[in-house]
Structure formats: structure tokens, C-alpha cells
Amino acid sequence: MSTQPIIYVLSDSVGETAELVVKAGLSQFKNGDYKIQRVPYVEDKETVDEFLALAKDTVSIVGFTLVDPELRAYVNSQAKKLEVEAIDIMGPTMDAMGRVFNRTPRLEAGLVHKLDEDYFKKIEAIEFAVKYDDGRDPRGIARADIILIGVSRTSKTPLSQYLAHKRIKVANVPIVPEVDPPEELMMVDPKKCIGLKITAEKLNSIRKERLKALGLGDQATYANMNRIEQELEYFQSIVDKIGCQVIDVSNKAVEETANHILRLKQENNSL
């Protein structure tokens, strides 16, 4: 019989959660020569039998995270029969939650890792929105899930960030009469592009407030009505050329516009 203690970690997923718990426990024991053997994707009694038999012949503990109640019960009963120390790492927690919440658990393996995947997708989308904000790099247009286009102060950046938190990669492109829009904008699927329209009066008010916030006079060309109308006419010519959908953001909060965009995306994906 081996004298080095072994902790077998059985899991119906990758086993990372169980291993972390075991390591946390081991950290309380100084100078221990312990071995952890992770056994992922356990789905049948044969695998359970194999490692319980190994544990019986060594100085071992079997720790397990299994969501299937039948398999959990089997491990516990067989371990007791073979006099193997077995620890149900997640079962008692799920059972207690079910009792207190009066709800039935989903009993799906690997959900923690699905949540982790969602988290990293969100971070990736946020980084994407920053990198391809305000037309900084037109290469992002082809890679984006959604491309927002509009004149200055139509909430392109806050919308990009809001949608990024929904794990959607957004590039945004400013429309300025003196600058031709990037060629990439004319090459993507028009369904991915969304124009942000605003009334001249509303834009004039927003830009004046912006100039005041910067400590500048509100008579600058940036807030001039003739200039604004010129920009909006140019914007309209661009969205007409692309053939994309347009949302009027004049009196909409960012959240309201974002939800409208999400609905459009869902409709387009279902076509």
C-alpha cells in the first residue's frame, strides 16, 4: 500500500472547482506530501468503481462534485461499503439551497465554466468597444457584431459600452462631412450597421451644453445650426448609401436605444 496520501477528485465537468476546494483544505496542513489526481467528466458507475477501488488500496480520500443525484448516492454508498473516505463537495450545498429556496437545481454539469466563459466574452467585448471607438481603426468594422454610425454627440460611445456589457462587439464610426467614411463601412452587411439619427434642435442643445462644460462659448461652429444641418444631411446621405436601419435617438435614453438595437439584432438573426 502506498504511503503518500492521494486525493482523487471526481467531477462530471473539468473538476477545477473540486480541486480548488481540496487545495484550500490542504493549505491548512503544513509540510504535507499530498497528491491530487483530478478525474474529469465522470458520467458512469464504472469510473466511480475504478477509483474507489484504487482509493481502498492507498491512503486516500475521494472528493467529488457530481450534480446527478443518483451518481452522488452511488459514490456515497459504495465508499461506505469499501470504507473509503469520500467527501461530497457540492451536494450538501445544493441540497440546502434547494430546501431554503424551495426550488429544484438544474443538475447541469459545468455551469460555473459556462458563467466564466460569459464573463470573458463580456471583457473581450468591452476591450473591443474601446479599441474600435470613434473610428480609430476601420479594421474593427469587419469584426464587429454591430456598427454604430452617427454625427458627434449621438451617444455612440456610451451605446457601444452598454452593448459590450451584453457581450456584443460594437465598433462606432463618426460621420463628418469633411471626411469620407471608411471603405470597410460600405463592404459589410447593412444589417450590421445602425445609424443614429437626431433632430437638429436636440443636437444643438446637446452641443451647447457640451461646449459650456468645456468652458467654451456656445457660439462655436460645433453648435452652429447651419453646421449641424449640414452634418445631418451628410449623415442621411451615408445611411441611404449603406441602406442600413436608423434609430432616432433625439429623446431616448442610452438604455432605451440599446434595447431597440438588441431587438433589431435579434430580428435580423432570425431572418
UniProtKB/Swiss-Prot annotation:
Catalytic activity annotation: N(tele)-phospho-L-histidyl/L-threonyl-[pyruvate, phosphate dikinase] + ADP = N(tele)-phospho-L-histidyl/O-phospho-L-threonyl-[pyruvate, phosphate dikinase] + AMP + H(+); N(tele)-phospho-L-histidyl/O-phospho-L-threonyl-[pyruvate, phosphate dikinase] + phosphate + H(+) = N(tele)-phospho-L-histidyl/L-threonyl-[pyruvate, phosphate dikinase] + diphosphate
Role, per record: Bifunctional serine/threonine kinase and phosphorylase involved in the regulation of the pyruvate, phosphate dikinase (PPDK) by catalyzing its phosphorylation/dephosphorylation.
Protein name: Putative pyruvate, phosphate dikinase regulatory protein
Pfam families to which the protein is assigned, alphabetical: Kinase-PPPase (PF03618)
Record-linked NCBIfam families: PRK05339.1
Keyword terms: Kinase, Nucleotide-binding, Serine/threonine-protein kinase, Transferase
Enzyme class of the recorded protein, top EC level: transferase
Protein EC: 2.7.11.32, 2.7.4.27
Organism name: Oceanobacillus iheyensis (strain DSM 14371 / CIP 107618 / JCM 11309 / KCTC 3954 / HTE831)
GO molecular function list: ADP binding; ATP binding; phosphotransferase activity, phosphate group as acceptor; protein serine/threonine kinase activity
Residues bound to ADP: 150-157
Highest taxon, organism lineage: Bacteria
Family stated for the protein in its record: Belongs to the pyruvate, phosphate/water dikinase regulatory protein family. PDRP subfamily.
Membrane-spanning intervals of the chain: none
